[in-house]
């Protein structure tokens, strides 16, 4: 009688006590670290008045993490239990996979998707757009707020099941490693094990079918060469194919579960192979052939309705559906009276570009090496009853610029805590030396705008924590050889006690917070001082403009940041920079002294309404008038809109298909490069009243003549977009054509050459297109920078109107030269006129240059030096 075979027992894991202890210690360290981080973060949220926001985030982030943890842990745990049961049934003792492994895999799997917690917040607080997609008739909120969360949850479940399936397969392979063939395995493997595999397979097929079914909704925001959104093939071939494929996968799951339960495991691989082939045929081959042989020969007739969908939904997604179209009745000639009538416009034409004036500000107004002027911004103010555009820059403090020996912990965190004041100049004023006039200047700040709180504790360069209200006074500002000190008098920051000092020492890895004798219970710790990081910590759901600008409001310095609603899956909308929906619903104000943050809604959309549901009381509707005076239409957003509108202004399907009237942003020459014109702010009388607008000239694609200009209003009718179209049959010069005319002007060419030969570098600034009455004025500033000097000087302003070109040392002189011979009834107030015209200076320079060359040839170096000095005097340089 043959004895039954003796099978080896399953693997017994070694004692895990040491491992468990180390895992416990590791877990404890993580828990303590996270607890310290979240508690100190809660203290910060409490200090800025957003404690409820933090608690909402904590609830949703932890809720989402635990949801994902459960999604992964339950299948893994049940699989582990099943493996133990099956191996116990066969061997008499179980194969024990530690449950800590289930916990660890689930924990780290949940960590990988934890940053998607906002999808749950939007899912449960979804708000309708009021716009339904034309294919399925579902509100756009389903695609933007609900579908992403459903896909994450179902995808996580499927991933958990596939991991469980793989673990079960490897566990059983190990437990039955002595089996020599599949037939032997099928014969001896317990039926409960096949049922385990059967259940896992069916659940995996079921979830795969669900994901395939949901994927059909994604066709409405797919990208094609022709349009954005579902095309004819997507709607009529791909969508039905995906439904059919989903049903096939579900039926295959039932069949696979049945045959595995009947011990025919090898059939599963055949089923998967057949499904793969069917999927290729349904989702790639069939759509390709229909597109190639049915649609493309008559593409417009098939795709026309879908092109119309793409146009309409794209315009809605970028807030371009209410653009006002106006004809610009172009007249060739502007006379001097037109200039006089447009005095507010002329007085605010920007002849100082932000790059040259930033260099001027840095050289003349940084005052000390540790102060930094990071950027220059444009805003408008009412000064002496005049509407004035100003260029403003904050004077921030960077401890990195302190001498290396002064970069101590005390200096960086307790003494040098804040910047001081701002610098401001009008956009079109220039001194005799070619430098800007200052309306706010020096330390303490002086000028036409009063600043009562010039300290800047929060800004663009404040990227480290500081402690204020300590026993050590803070450096306030220098005055001559004397340094003035101060104590913080605001309510910004987190009040410290000993316990909090310990917590923040752990958080920052800085023991000095505990050891320093200067820090008391009245001290306040300021962190998240970088303004963009600060607002994104409070409200991480927006994309923030990377160019915050500074404003003086009621004597205080405020930062203003534009917040954008950005989505990637809006139906039928064109994609730009990785997204296909962009709005600017919120303006954020940050106080530079106390760090207070306010979120004001200026143009509500569904994205903000969803956040208002989740975070009641955070978004403010009633913006104070003093704040409203300083909001402006953001340039980055305007650039995106212009890019979209350049194509999607063609609402006629045939014209869009043929690309008959595609526009482009006009190009200009800046220094030696050809670049796209950047949107710029001008003061124009849109409705017989001067107002602050953002504008951009447009040209036909691959051509240089102007076809239209786009304007965004910033004052009373904030956010209104207007397109002014020029007459189709007339040639209106674009910026590059004006640049070419300037290049071809022989007198200017000689002057530029002479300046370059005299040791200076000519910098041609931005060419501005300024609509005046029914014509266009072109203005380009020209700067000089000496080889050794870092300060650019404005030396020339070029103005062009129709066929006329004129220059002057300032805008008013250039305009007088442009309209010389005309006798206006009155004359705009102008700066003191230089004694010599440009033409006279050119003649003098030619004479001096000729004598300089002759002296060099004859070796008369005394005369050479004298002539070189005189050339420098004519150009505005004095001294040797």
Swiss-Prot record:
Entry keyword set: Cell membrane, Membrane, Transmembrane, Transmembrane helix
Protein name as catalogued: UPF0182 protein AF_1421
Location in or out of the cell: Cell membrane
The UniProt record lists the keyword Iron: no
UniProt keyword Membrane, yes or no: yes
Organism: Archaeoglobus fulgidus (strain ATCC 49558 / DSM 4304 / JCM 9628 / NBRC 100126 / VC-16)
Transmembrane segment boundaries: 19-41, 61-83, 103-125, 152-174, 195-217, 237-259, 268-290
PANTHER family to which the protein is assigned, alphabetical: UPF0182 PROTEIN SLL1060
Gene Ontology terms: cellular component: extracellular region; plasma membrane
Its membrane topology: Multi-pass membrane protein
Family stated for the protein in its record: Belongs to the UPF0182 family.
Location, primary (coarse class): membrane
């Amino acid at each position: 009688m043959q004895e039954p075979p003796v099978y080896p027992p399953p693997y017994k894991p070694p004692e895990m006590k040491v491992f468990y202890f180390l895992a416990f210690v590791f877990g404890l360290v993580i828990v303590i670290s996270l607890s310290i981080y979240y508690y100190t973060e809660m203290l910060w949220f409490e200090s800025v008045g957003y404690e409820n926001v933090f608690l909402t985030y904590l609830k949703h982030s932890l809720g989402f993490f635990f949801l994902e943890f459960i999604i992964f842990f339950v299948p893994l745990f049940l699989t582990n239990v099943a493996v133990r049961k099956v191996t116990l049934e066969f061997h008499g003792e179980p194969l024990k996979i530690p449950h800590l492994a289930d916990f660890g895999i689930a924990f780290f799997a949940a960590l990988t998707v934890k940053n998607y917690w906002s999808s749950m917040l939007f899912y449960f607080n979804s708000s309708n757009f009021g716009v339904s997609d034309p294919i399925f008739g579902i509100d756009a909120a389903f695609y933007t707020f609900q579908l992403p969360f459903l896909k994450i949850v179902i995808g996580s479940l499927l991933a958990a099941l596939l991991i469980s399936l793989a673990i079960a397969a490897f566990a059983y392979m190990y437990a039955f490693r002595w089996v020599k063939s599949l037939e032997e395995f099928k014969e001896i493997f317990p039926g409960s094990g096949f049922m385990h595999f059967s259940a896992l397979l069916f659940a995996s097929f079921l979830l795969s079918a669900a994901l395939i079914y949901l994927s059909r909704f994604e066709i409405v925001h797919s990208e094609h060469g022709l349009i954005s959104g579902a095309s004819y093939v997507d709607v009529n071939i791909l969508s039905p194919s995906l439904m059919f494929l989903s049903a096939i996968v579900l039926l295959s799951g039932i069949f696979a579960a049945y045959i595995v339960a009947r011990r025919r495991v090898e059939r599963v691989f055949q089923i998967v192979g057949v499904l793969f082939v069917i999927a290729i045929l349904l989702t790639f081959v069939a759509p390709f052939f229909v597109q190639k042989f049915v649609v493309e020969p008559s593409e417009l007739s098939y795709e026309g309705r879908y092109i119309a969908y793409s146009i309409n939904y794209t315009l809605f997604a970028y807030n371009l559906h209410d653009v006002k179209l106006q004809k610009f009745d172009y007249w060739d000639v502007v006379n001097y009276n037109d200039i006089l009538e447009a005095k507010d416009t002329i007085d605010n034409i920007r002849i100082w570009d932000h790059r040259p004036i930033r260099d001027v500000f840095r050289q003349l107004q940084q005052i000390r090496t540790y102060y930094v002027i990071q950027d220059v911004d444009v805003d408008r103010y009412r000064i002496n009853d005049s509407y004035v555009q100003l260029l403003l820059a904050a004077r921030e403090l960077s401890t990195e610029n302190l001498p290396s020996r002064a970069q101590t912990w005390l200096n960086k965190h307790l003494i040098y805590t804040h910047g001081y004041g701002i610098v401001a100049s009008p956009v079109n004023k220039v001194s005799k030396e070619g430098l800007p006039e200052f309306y706010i200047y020096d330390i303490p700040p002086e000028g036409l705008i009063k600043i009562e709180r010039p300290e800047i504790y929060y800004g663009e360069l404040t990227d480290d924590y500081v402690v204020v209200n300590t026993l050590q006074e803070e450096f306030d500002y220098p005055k001559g050889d004397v340094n003035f000190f101060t104590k913080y008098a605001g309510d910004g920051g987190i009040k410290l006690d000993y316990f909090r000092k310990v917590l923040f020492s752990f958080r920052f890895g800085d023991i000095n917070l505990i050891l320093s004798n200067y820090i008391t219970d009245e001290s306040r710790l300021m962190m998240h001082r970088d303004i963009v990081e600060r607002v994104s910590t409070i409200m991480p759901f927006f994309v923030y403009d990377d160019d915050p600008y500074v404003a003086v409001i009621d004597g205080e310095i405020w930062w203003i940041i534009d917040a954008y609603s950005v989505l990637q899956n809006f139906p039928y909308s064109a994609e730009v920079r990785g997204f296909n929906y962009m709005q600017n619903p919120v303006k954020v104000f940050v106080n530079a002294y106390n760090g207070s943050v306010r979120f004001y809604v200026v143009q509500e959309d569904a994205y903000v309404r969803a956040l208002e549901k989740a975070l009641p009381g955070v978004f403010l509707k009633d913006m104070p008038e003093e704040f409203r005076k300083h909001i402006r239409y953001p340039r980055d957003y305007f650039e995106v809109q212009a890019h979209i509108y350049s194509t999607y202004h063609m609402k006629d399907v045939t014209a869009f298909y043929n690309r008959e009237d595609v526009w482009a942003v006009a190009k200009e020459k800046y220094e030696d490069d050809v670049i796209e014109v950047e949107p710029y702010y001008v003061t124009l009388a849109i409705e017989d009243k001067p107002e602050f607008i953002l504008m951009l000239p447009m040209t036909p694609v691959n051509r240089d003549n102007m076809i239209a200009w786009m304007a965004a209003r910033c004052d009373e009718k904030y956010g209104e977009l207007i397109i002014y179209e020029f007459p189709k049959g007339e040639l209106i010069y674009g910026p590059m054509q004006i640049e070419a005319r300037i290049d071809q002007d022989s007198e200017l060419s000689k002057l530029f050459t002479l300046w370059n030969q005299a040791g200076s570098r000519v910098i041609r600034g931005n060419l501005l297109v300024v609509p005046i009455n029914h014509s266009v004025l072109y203005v380009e500033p020209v700067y000089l920078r000496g080889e050794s000097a870092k300060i650019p000087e404005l030396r020339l302003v070029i103005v062009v109107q129709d066929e006329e070109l004129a220059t002057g040392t300032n805008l008013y002189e250039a305009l007088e030269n442009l309209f010389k011979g005309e006798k206006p009834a009155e004359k705009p107030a102008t700066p003191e006129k230089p004694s010599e015209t440009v033409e006279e200076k050119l003649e003098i320079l030619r004479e001096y240059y000729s004598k300089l060359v002759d002296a060099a040839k004859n070796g008369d170096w005394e005369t050479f030096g004298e002539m070189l000095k005189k050339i420098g005097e004519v150009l505005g340089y004095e001294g040797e």
